């Protein structure tokens, strides 16, 4: 019997019921809606849970407002398990297609123009519809069945849709995260399986998948590796995917390390690198590293600690400054020669300060500042900023993006956009602005925020 993949399809919620007394495995979900979803004009019917719904036992659920509406498959945790157990996931949770996450068709395009140097051929950003808003700062909050693995899959899916790349041609996938639900078990293998990356043989994907770690630059460190790999003629790899995703962690306020709880967010970004139909060429890069103890999380500890004054000048500013200046010197560039500058955003102040110090004008760096909308998404932070710039950039513009990872190091990249950037833009409904200003965003209080961050 052939397997059926509905992950990119759109379904219809035919019948549903309200589960207000869930069994133990589903207890953390509280009350939820369960139903029958049909696909392909009713030829296929599957049971599924409606997710991204905060429902209390007292809520009066109007089934007539749900039944008959179109839904989109989502990749989520399935139910709660003990800490030592495997985490069950499923791609048959669903959200309403006319709300935060609309359906987008995944149509594969044959490779067309080949470029001399590699670059980004597509990208995607995923953040949750839930937010907490305090003192003018909004932060994305995962729903209770989300984590860094589910965000990685969703971001990778959006990148494939945007690029038009055949998933079977992706020969390498990197996932950078510091909030993997497992200490030993990669996110990348799950991404590869769900998105069917590489040639599929039975239940095995012909793709190299690896997780990476270097605090908030775990993903950007791999940009150069991905670009190099697709350029090596003997690798046989046409495309490589790099994902940065985190459910950024911080101790509760009032506890040691709780100061970080003001800025942590949730989400991820995925970039596909190749030499065909490039939207932004990678012109060059520079990386720097030092053993600086500005931020850490010991093995077995749930929340990170930070080194106070070491997080500023000796850490973030020193590395971002050096990587940026060295790259600009190598290409004999002044700040005025660039169209956009993207820096890592641990808080709203640091990226603005370093941008001004380096001579960039407001219009060069402000489009990348997304921490005020999503919070610090750790490994996804500077990639989300880069995506925000790519969403609005014009052809033949130069972008300098400099990431930062505690412990400590920075990667600076120089990108040049192409005409294909505009051509592919219409393929992506769910861009950064769409998610930042979405009318279906749901705001939660601090107690709910802490509960959702802990997950199932």
Feature-to-residue mapping (PLM):
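Cys/His-rich short segments
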Residues: 1-8, 456
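Glycine-rich active-site loops that engage anionic ligands at enzyme catalytic sites
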Residues: 14-56, 60
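Short nucleic-acid-contacting surface segments enriched for D/E, G, S/T with interspersed K/R
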Residues: 53-74
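OB-fold/S1-family single-stranded nucleic acid-binding modules
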Residues: 74-106
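Condensing-enzyme catalytic core mediating Claisen C-C bond formation in acyl metabolism
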Residues: 105-146, 256-314, 318, 407, ...
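Claisen-condensing/thiolase-fold acyl-transfer catalytic domains that form or cleave C-C bonds
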Residues: 149, 153, 179-180, 198-206, ...
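Phosphate/pyrophosphate-binding loops at sites that engage ATP/ADP/AMP, CoA/4′-phosphopantetheine
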Residues: 155-171, 321-337, 358, 393
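Flexible, glycine-rich active-site loops centered on histidine and acidic residues
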Residues: 227, 231-270
């Amino acid at each position: 019997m052939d397997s059926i993949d509905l992950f990119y399809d759109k379904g219809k919620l035919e019948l549903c019921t309200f589960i207000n007394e869930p069994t133990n495995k589903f207890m953390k979900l509280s009350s939820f809606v369960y139903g029958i979803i049909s696909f392909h004009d009713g030829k296929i019917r599957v049971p599924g849970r409606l997710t991204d719904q905060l429902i209390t036992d007292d809520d009066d659920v109007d089934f007539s407002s749900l039944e008959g509406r179109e839904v989109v498959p989502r990749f989520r945790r399935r139910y709660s398990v003990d800490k030592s157990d495997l985490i069950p996931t499923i791609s048959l949770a669903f959200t309403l297609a006319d709300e935060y996450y609309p359906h987008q068709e995944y149509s594969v395009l044959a490779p067309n123009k080949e470029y001399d140097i590699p670059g980004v051929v597509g990208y995607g950003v995923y953040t949750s519809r839930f937010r907490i808003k305090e003192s003018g700062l909004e932060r994305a909050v995962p729903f209770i069945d989300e984590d860094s693995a589910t965000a990685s899959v969703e971001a990778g899916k959006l990148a494939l849709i945007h690029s038009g790349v055949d998933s079977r041609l992706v020969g390498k996938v990197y996932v950078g995260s510091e909030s993997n639900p497992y200490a030993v078990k990669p996110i990348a293998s799950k991404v590869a399986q769900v998105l069917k990356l590489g040639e599929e043989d039975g239940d095995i994907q012909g793709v190299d998948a690896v997780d990476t770690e270097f605090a908030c630059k775990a993903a950007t460190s791999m940009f150069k590796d991905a670009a190099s790999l697709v350029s090596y003629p003997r690798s046989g790899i046409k495309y490589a995917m790099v994902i940065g995703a985190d459910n950024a962690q911080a101790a509760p306020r009032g506890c040691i390390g709780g100061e970080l709880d003001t800025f942590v967010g949730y989400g991820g970004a995925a970039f596909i690198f190749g030499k065909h139909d490039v939207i932004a060429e990678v012109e060059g890069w520079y990386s720097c590293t030092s053993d600086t103890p500005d931020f850490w999380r010991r093995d077995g500890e749930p929340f990170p600690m930070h080194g106070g004054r070491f997080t500023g000048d000796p850490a973030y500013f020193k590395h971002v400054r050096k990587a940026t200046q060295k790259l600009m010197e190598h290409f004999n560039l002044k700040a005025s020669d660039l169209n956009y500058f993207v820096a890592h955003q641990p808080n709203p102040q640091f990226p603005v300060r370093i941008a001004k110090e380096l001579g960039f004008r407001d219009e060069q760096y402000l489009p990348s500042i997304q921490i005020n909308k999503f919070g610090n998404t750790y490994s996804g932070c500077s990639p989300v900023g880069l995506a925000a710039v790519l969403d609005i950039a014009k052809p033949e513009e130069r972008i300098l993006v400099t990431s930062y990872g505690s412990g400590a190091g920075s990667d600076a990249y120089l990108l040049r956009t192409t005409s294909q950037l505009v051509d592919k833009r219409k393929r992506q409904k769910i861009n950064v602005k769409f998610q930042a200003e979405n009318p279906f965003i749901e705001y939660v209080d601090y107690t709910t925020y802490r509960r959702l961050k802990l997950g199932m």
